[in-house]
């Protein structure tokens, strides 16, 4: 009996791997838990071909997402500057601060494309003026945008 068997996971298993991963486990773990509950399948040439096909599809999808992020970065740079209006007091000091939600709203208004506010890094802004904000569009693509904060 082999000390380890190779299997392909059908779902994410916290201590083992993600869906589609090729892993080596103890034969008893595979035979008594993973295989009977449909959480994995034994590695065969046909299954290996399916895994390679799935990986190629995923790589293609990731490349398309990256290209979309690069295109959006270009669109952001052509717009140039985004404006956020906030209530101000004396000496152009803001009541409150400019949040990443405010910046996301300004971007959505200008581009008509929704962006997650958690992907926006805003420096501490307590006065009116011009600032640089970082937007993470993809794991490999970030954009620097110019933000103008004006008072009313």
From Swiss-Prot:
Database matches in SUPFAM superfamilies: L9 N-domain-like, Ribosomal protein L9 C-domain
Any one GO MF annotation of this record: rRNA binding
Please give the biological process terms from Gene Ontology that the record holds: translation
Q: Which InterPro entries match?
A: Ribosomal_bL9, Ribosomal_bL9/RNase_H1_N, Ribosomal_bL9_bac/chp, Ribosomal_bL9_C, Ribosomal_bL9_C_sf, Ribosomal_bL9_N, Ribosomal_bL9_N_sf
Sorted alphabetically, the keyword list is: Ribonucleoprotein, Ribosomal protein, RNA-binding, rRNA-binding
A Pfam family: Ribosomal_L9_C
The entry's cellular-component GO terms read: ribonucleoprotein complex; ribosome
Q: What does this protein do?
A: Binds to the 23S rRNA.
Family of the protein in this entry: Belongs to the bacterial ribosomal protein bL9 family.
Q: What is this protein called?
A: Large ribosomal subunit protein bL9
Species in which this protein is naturally found: Synechococcus sp. (strain CC9605)
């Amino acid at each position: 009996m082999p000390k380890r068997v190779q299997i392909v996971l059908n779902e994410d298993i916290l201590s083992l791997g993600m869906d589609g991963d090729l892993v080596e486990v103890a034969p008893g773990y595979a035979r008594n838990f993973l295989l009977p509950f449909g959480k994995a399948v034994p590695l065969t040439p046909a299954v290996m071909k399916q895994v390679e096909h799935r990986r190629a599809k995923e790589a293609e999808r990731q490349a398309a997402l990256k290209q979309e992020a690069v295109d959006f970065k270009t669109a952001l740079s052509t717009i140039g500057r985004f404006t956020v209006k906030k209530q101000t007091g004396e000496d152009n000091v803001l009541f409150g601060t400019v949040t990443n939600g405010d910046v996301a709203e300004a971007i959505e208004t200008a581009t008509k494309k929704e962006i997650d506010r958690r992907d926006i890094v805003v420096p501490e802004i307590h006065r009116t003026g011009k600032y640089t904000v970082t937007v993470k569009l993809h794991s490999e693509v970030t954009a620097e945008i110019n933000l103008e904060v004006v008072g009313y």
